[in-house]
Amino acid sequence: MIDDASPELQFHADAARTTADVPRRAFIRKALHGYEAKRDESRAAFADWQHARHAAAAIKYEGVNRLDEYLQEFERKFTARGGEVFWASHGAQARDYILGLARERGVKSIIKSKTMTSEEIHLNDALEKEGFNVVESDLGEFIQQLKHETPYHFVFPCMHLKRDEISALFEKELGSAPSDSPEELTMIARRFLRRRYITADMGISGANFIVAETGMISITENEGNARLTTAMPKIHVALVGIEKVVPRLADLALLLPMLATAGTGQNLTCYNSMYGGPRQKGEIDGPEEFHVVLLDNHRTRLLADAEQRDALHCIRCGACLNVCPIFKNIGGHAYGTTYQGPIGSVITPHFRGLQDWKHLSGASSLCGACTEACPVKIDIHHHLLHNRRNAVAQKKDWRERLLWSGFVQLMTRPWAYRLAARLAPLAQWLHPFLQDSGFDPLAAWTKTREFPQAAAPTFGDYWRRRKGAGR
């Protein structure tokens, strides 16, 4: 990491380092190729995948465009069963509420299932600084926690790691014997985590959906860890972004299979659970307290932008990451933010500031694969263009303005264009000397790329000869 580097400089440094690791890139591509095959097979289970996308988009459109109404309906029905709701306008409020609750209840040990919102507000750091013992129970998140790294991908947190690396990590951190078996590595983590479920005083989860009609949250998973995290501790806290709301329970009949298909290439994930409040009288399991923290954290800023509001429809399936040529080459950590890939590049400037994070909008080939892959039809690649436009409109860079002004002058004056075409071979001949001098204005580009040789003859020469020949 570069000390005191801006997000953009850090991004360029991390992206350059990752792209230089060719074996790692090949490993990621192979993993994602397997995902694509499973995804296509699962899509075939739908009578009409495109119709399903339209229907899913309509559900999310209704939820987001009537957000206040549906969130209040959820709160009424959830609190009627003894649950508590806290509205957090920003990350610090959410952290303070959860920290305060843990202190008041004498909590010592906390178990967590996967929640990207907790990564977003740096909840683990805040809890650990206060002396709480925090353990991630999702296998991928647990591995990343042992490595002291953030998730690489918001569905596959440790997809960049090979078995021998995970084995070495477990040997170092957990004292286990080396193993090349995925099953044995999973059992090593399982044995460690089982004890933590039993001793945890608080369980923290996220939610895939908030159901307004029933006042419940929905969690979908493949490991069963979320069920243990939410059922065994006395206190359950769900930290959820406000955009996760959907109007009706029946909506999940479409959204859960869509999420599984787009996210992991499954028809349906293994465990799909609904949570509607603390343990009721006569029930033998479940938490004694259930708190839902509804997190804004600049989501309403994006909601106010009618042009890009549909970015809030995202169901965090990760499909856009899996097909993105940029993500496949630079990896998840290069983005420097909780939400990676194309959708992360759209929403992060809204959440964390356009000028500091505008560079992410340039981390795209604009091929449109992300938009095609999105199960809720978010127009992702056009939103990246909108972010670029808005960044320029908000604060024009004089160097970029000068560059494009010169380009316009060149392209609108035939004599200037012809002169530039004549001088291009000379400029290319001189360029290596300029590179060696350390004063190359194009160094960031030419360090890893070569310009194609200027054509000889030029297109203009060719066209004039063609006309002269009467063709």
What feature does the model see in each segment?
Residues 282-311, 321-322, 326-439:
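Ferredoxin-type iron-sulfur electron-transfer modules in oxidoreductases and energy-metabolism complexes
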Residues 80, 240, 269, 341, ...:
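Residue-level signal for pocket-adjacent positions within structured domains
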Residues 5-35, 45, 403-404, 408-471:
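Intrinsic disorder at enzyme termini
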Residues 1-307:
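The feature marks the mature, well-folded catalytic cores of soluble enzymes
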Residues 214, 250, 276-280, 340, ...:
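Short capping/connector residues at structural and topological boundaries
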Residues 314:
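Phosphate-binding glycine-rich loops and their immediate beta-loop-alpha structural context
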